[in-house]
Amino acid sequence: MRLISKVLVKTNCLEVGMRRAPQWYSHYSTTAGNARVNKKGSKVVPVLTGLALASIFAKKWYDDSQIKKADVTSVAVDASISAFPKKMGPPQWPFSTQYELIGKGVRCVSSITFKAYGLGIYVAAEDKHLVSEVLDSKFLSQAFIDTAAPPSPENSHQDNLRAALNDPAKAPILINNLLDSGIRLMSKNTPIKAGSFKLLMDGTKKSVLKNPDSQSQDKDRLEAGFQELHDCFRSVKGLVARDDDFFIELNKDCSMNLSYYARKKDEFVILGTVKEPLIGKLLFAHYLAAVDPPSPEARKEVIDALVSLS
């Protein structure tokens, strides 16, 4: 009991040997992989020890009454999980910028009948202009989008763009150009069934490897990136509750910030950063351009959003 009370006591982050938070988490005191904070930034505790984790199993894992229903600020994805916010960012959420939801759906594993996660794709509000700058560019329009000769008066540029984004050969080219522009994106993965941190890590790695472009990349760089991914999960063990959130922020350089939100405890865990840009680029290209994406529904909505922004 003395150990548990010591772990849960409120304390200043500098007193437990943690470095100052990065500038873009100005009012959150935490260290990647080593601390948890609530979203208000009012409490800092070390990562749960095995003793503290053991207490979880003595409690009911999740109460359905905690599921937040959709309102004017959110949209429903699945009845088993809370509605997804239309906008996410500081000060309520310790992300690098403000994000807006552009696509959501259910992510299935193994079988179309097995619902694993709710998936949301967000775009940085400040970067929405990049969609039209890239996808309306003269080069991409002439080479991949508005390619009918002679041009069809019945099809607008937006019609042609939608067709190109649904074309298995053209979509990866267009999406990769968009990712190369420095657009910031974020994925929100919310378990519909309780899982584990290992499943989150393995699922992320598998999504990267499902991108056909991964087969032609430098293997050493890929392995280095996967090691960084593994390191982000090194200090978190055990089960992941239904309706918790796993976030992946794609930065301008295609590095990724990984974080986790434990809804029942209102605690936000900064897992770390995957600096190797190949991992981030391959992952989000798989989300947005794959023939067999993790969530076809989410990809369809993202395509609709990209067309409307062009």
UniProtKB/Swiss-Prot annotation:
Its predominant location is mitochondrion
Q: Which domain of life is it from?
A: Eukaryota
Q: Where in the cell is it found?
A: Mitochondrion
Q: Where is the transit peptide?
A: 1-20
The record's SUPFAM superfamilies line, in alphabetical order, gives: Chalcone isomerase (SSF54626)
Q: Name one GO molecular function term.
A: intramolecular lyase activity
Tell whether Transit peptide is among the UniProt keywords.
Answer: yes
InterPro entries the UniProt entry points to: Chalcone_isomerase (IPR016087), Chalcone_isomerase_3-sand (IPR016088), Chalcone_isomerase_sf (IPR036298)
- Keywords, sorted A to Z: Mitochondrion, Transit peptide
Gene Ontology cellular component annotations, sorted alphabetically: mitochondrion
Family under the similarity heading = Belongs to the AIM18/AIM46 family.
Q: Provide the protein name.
A: Altered inheritance of mitochondria protein 46, mitochondrial
In its UniProt entry, the species of origin is given as Saccharomyces cerevisiae (strain YJM789) (Baker's yeast)
Q: Which gene encodes it?
A: AIM46
